[in-house]
Amino acid sequence: MTTIVLNPNEPVEVALRRFRRSIERTGLIKELRARTSYEKPTTERKRKKAAAVARLRKQVRRSMPPKKKY
């Protein structure tokens, strides 16, 4: 459960922003959206595999030296 302590003389908007940020850090919103509808295990594996491949490609691209522009 995510909780925040409201500081004295703190505007509600600032406290709400801190609360939203803390929820995003915990991954609660992402998990909630994932659980709104059922995803078949094969579809879930396929999605996770595609994400892993994309991460790997991005990592390889970043590790390569930049192309020469001449």
UniProtKB/Swiss-Prot annotation:
The protein's name in its UniProt record: Small ribosomal subunit protein bS21C
InterPro entries in alphabetical order: Ribosomal_bS21, Ribosomal_bS21_sf
Family membership: Belongs to the bacterial ribosomal protein bS21 family.
Alphabetized PANTHER family for the sequence: MITOCHONDRIAL 28S RIBOSOMAL PROTEIN S21, SMALL RIBOSOMAL SUBUNIT PROTEIN BS21
GO molecular function: structural constituent of ribosome
Top-rank taxon: Bacteria
GO biological process, one term: translation
Disordered: annotated segments: 37-70
Feature: compositional bias, Basic residues: 45-70
Keyword annotations: Ribonucleoprotein, Ribosomal protein
Keyword Ribosomal protein: yes
GO cellular component: ribonucleoprotein complex; ribosome
Gene3D superfamilies (UniProt xref): Ribosomal protein S8 (1.20.5.1150)
